[in-house]
């Protein structure tokens, strides 16, 4: 009789565990999401046991039928963990034994440990999860691309240090948020190559002596290969840390987009109006329309960063191989996935319904002497060294500021007084449209270049969607 009913160990113990230990050890409140993966792995394990001569055909078929019944009951909620179940593995073994009996159900545990089980299930769950997250990220990219396509010629103030710098196209700025998100999806796709290695068959750490075939289980579960080193297979969680990093990076990239939207929606900027369905009000101030989605995106990025750093701290000092510390590996990653699955559709909805005040942005685009660089580059095209041209353009700004006028309002004599090459012809470039159109090198803000960037974003998104469906 086991001293620890509902768990997968106990024969060596005469008593226990203490209630406080049982409560501390319990993980079914978070690892139950692995149940479908556990059952799929158990079915593959039954087939491998049969191939190794450790099960008869009838025993294999009986286990598979019991596992199918258990899977159905898990799916509809009629089977769930009990308070006495330590983890998802023990709960499901209990469920299987209830269906096929202790003699047959007990045979399935041969040749496997919770150590290789959980490492495999975590990888399998995470491979599916990152595809869902990637799809959500691509939804935000699609919203950004749609807005960019809808505003192909709208000009806005480009900023550095949050100070007006140079005029840029709104579409150019929006696509600048799309590119890092696409890189995040590329990271998720690349991550899958390292996650697609199955630890199954590694046992507790030393491998199996029962003639089992780890490659067969790996293939059945959709992995690319089995692990090369059984100790590493059970102990490694760098795949979890890598995923947590990419999830945190997505949070950071969303936070930067959110910060722009928060600023743009203020009265002081006035670039955008938020859609009623994607904003909230105040309990006391009737006039308020608050960018809550953007603010929550900004806040959740800190949570995702915390999940990453917490996981790394858990991993940093563990000796090989498996240690119980690794029970703490899943909740941070599960939470990061859950937060992004909640956040991404909301951000996509927010972005897709933004209403831009293009007249307001165009009005602000030249303010702050944002065409000063155009003056300097105009002089360079006339043979003036850039260092000298930069000084001359700065002097022109100083003169215009002193008079409270724009650069285009300086008199010809004032211009040539600053530099003999700085003639009234410079006014040809002192328009925001001329400034934007002139920046037509690859990646620049000229409409022809931004149209190419839009095509790149859409083509890359389509390619990544296909890659993630494989």
Swiss-Prot record:
Pathway connected to this protein: Amino-acid biosynthesis; L-arginine biosynthesis; L-arginine from L-ornithine and carbamoyl phosphate: step 3/3
UniProt xrefs under InterPro entries: Arg_succ_lyase_C (IPR029419), Argininosuccinate_lyase (IPR009049), Fumarase/histidase_N (IPR024083), Fumarate_lyase_CS (IPR020557), Fumarate_lyase_fam (IPR000362), Fumarate_lyase_N (IPR022761), L-Aspartase-like (IPR008948)
Molecular function (Gene Ontology), one example: argininosuccinate lyase activity
PROSITE patterns in UniProt: FUMARATE_LYASES
EC number: 4.3.2.1
Top-level taxon in the UniProt lineage: Bacteria
GO biological process terms on file: arginine biosynthetic process via ornithine; L-arginine biosynthetic process
Lyase recorded as keyword: yes
Gene3D superfamilies: Fumarase/aspartase (C-terminal domain), Fumarase/aspartase (Central domain), Fumarase/aspartase (N-terminal domain)
SUPFAM superfamilies: L-aspartase-like
GO CC annotations on file: cytosol
Subcellular location per the Swiss-Prot or TrEMBL entry: Cytoplasm
Keyword set, alphabetical order: Amino-acid biosynthesis, Arginine biosynthesis, Cytoplasm, Lyase
Catalytically driven reaction(s): 2-(N(omega)-L-arginino)succinate = fumarate + L-arginine
PANTHER family in the cross-refs: ARGININOSUCCINATE LYASE
Family named by the database record: Belongs to the lyase 1 family. Argininosuccinate lyase subfamily.
Protein's name in the database: Argininosuccinate lyase
Gene that this polypeptide is encoded by: argH
């Amino acid at each position: 009789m086991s001293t620890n009913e509902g768990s997968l160990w106990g024969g060596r113990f005469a008593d226990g565990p203490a209630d406080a230990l049982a409560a501390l050890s319990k993980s079914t409140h978070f690892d139950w999401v692995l149940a479908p993966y556990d059952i799929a792995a158990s079915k593959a394990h039954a087939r491998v046991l049969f191939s190794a001569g450790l099960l008869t055909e009838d025993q294999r078929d009986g286990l598979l039928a019991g596992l199918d019944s258990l899977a159905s009951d898990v799916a509809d909620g009629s089977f769930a963990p009990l308070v006495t179940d330590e983890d998802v593995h023990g709960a499901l073994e209990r469920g299987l034994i209830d269906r096929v009996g202790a003699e047959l159900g007990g045979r399935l545990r041969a040749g496997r440990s919770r150590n290789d089980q959980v490492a495999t299930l975590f990888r399998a769950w995470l491979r599916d999860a990152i595809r869902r997250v990637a799809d959500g990220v691509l939804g935000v990219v699609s919203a950004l691309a749609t807005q960019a396509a809808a505003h192909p010629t709208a000009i806005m103030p480009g900023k550095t240090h949050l100070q007006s710098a140079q005029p840029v196209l709104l579409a150019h700025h929006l696509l600048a948020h799309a590119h890092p998100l696409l890189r995040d999806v590329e990271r998720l796709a690349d991550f899958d190559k390292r996650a697609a290695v199955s630890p199954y068959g590694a046992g507790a750490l030393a491998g199996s002596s029962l003639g089992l075939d780890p490659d067969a289980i790996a293939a059945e579960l959709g992995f690319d290969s089995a692990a090369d080193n059984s100790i590493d297979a059970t102990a490694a969680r760098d795949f979890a840390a890598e995923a947590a990093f990419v999830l945190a990076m997505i949070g950071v990239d969303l936070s930067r987009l959110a910060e722009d939207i928060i600023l743009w929606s203020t009265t002081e900027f006035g670039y955008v109006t938020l859609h009623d369905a994607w904003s909230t009000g105040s309990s006391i101030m009737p006039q308020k329309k608050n960018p809550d989605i953007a603010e929550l995106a900004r806040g959740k990025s800190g949570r995702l960063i915390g999940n990453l750093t917490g996981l790394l701290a858990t991993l940093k000092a563990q000796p090989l191989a498996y240690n119980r510390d690794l029970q703490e590996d899943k909740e941070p990653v599960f939470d990061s996935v859950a937060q992004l699955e909640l956040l991404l559709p909301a951000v996509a909805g927010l972005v897709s319904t933004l209403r831009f005040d293009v007249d307001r942005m165009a009005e602000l685009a030249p303010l702050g002497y944002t065409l000063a660089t155009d003056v300097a580059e105009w002089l360079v095209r006339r043979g003036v060294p850039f260092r000298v041209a930069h000084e001359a353009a700065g002097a022109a700004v100083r003169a215009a500021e002193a008079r409270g006028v724009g650069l285009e309002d300086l008199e010809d004599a004032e211009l040539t007084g600053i530099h003999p090459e700085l003639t009234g012809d410079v006014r040809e470039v002192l328009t925001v449209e001329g400034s934007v159109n002139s920046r037509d090198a690859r990646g620049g803000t000229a409409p022809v270049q931004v149209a190419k960037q839009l095509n790149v974003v859409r083509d890359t998104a389509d390619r990544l969607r296909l890659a993630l469906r494989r």
